[in-house]
């Protein structure tokens, strides 16, 4: 989008704060329904970030796939859960929570120490005039399809297998 710089900066700060508040809502809210709605807010904010970056196809895909399908599936699964069983076995602190805290803290500390030491100016950013002219003949969705079937084939297939395992796990949990 060709927005004025002040409006673009304001939207970045607004979407960033919405993203942070939504993520905190996903993690900190005890009601799973509210947590799922907060996840929807996070996914919509990410989609709006893509729109600000002029990636309209990715933004539409984000809205359709994640917000329109996966988040709704999560909300339906949470609504089918028996809430009395969910709150009955609630422990304040478990061993898994301690391990998760240690892992997340170590990742956070490593990121905090690595990011300031990175030479961001050494990264080559591609700009529009420097790109190959033949790429203009192929539409954006065709470029995405070409990259998914060549360069990103293995990660794309791994993500599809992970989603398949998650759906099978959801079906198994729903049957019990």
From Swiss-Prot:
User: Where does this protein reside within or beyond the cell?
Assistant: Plastid, Chloroplast thylakoid membrane
Q: Which UniProt keywords apply?
A: Chloroplast, Membrane, NAD, NADP, Plastid, Plastoquinone, Quinone, Thylakoid, Translocase, Transmembrane, Transmembrane helix, Transport
Q: Which residues cross the membrane?
A: 10-30, 32-52, 63-83, 92-112, 152-172
- Membrane topology type, per the record? Multi-pass membrane protein
Q: Which GO molecular-function terms appear in the entry?
A: NADH dehydrogenase (ubiquinone) activity; quinone binding
Taxonomically, the superkingdom here is Eukaryota
Query: A Gene Ontology CC term for this entry?
Result: chloroplast thylakoid membrane
Query: Family assignment?
Result: Belongs to the complex I subunit 6 family.
Task: State how it assembles.
Answer: NDH is composed of at least 16 different subunits, 5 of which are encoded in the nucleus.
The identity of this protein, by name, is NAD(P)H-quinone oxidoreductase subunit 6, chloroplastic
Organism expressing this protein natively: Cicer arietinum
Question: Which gene does this sequence derive from?
Answer: ndhG
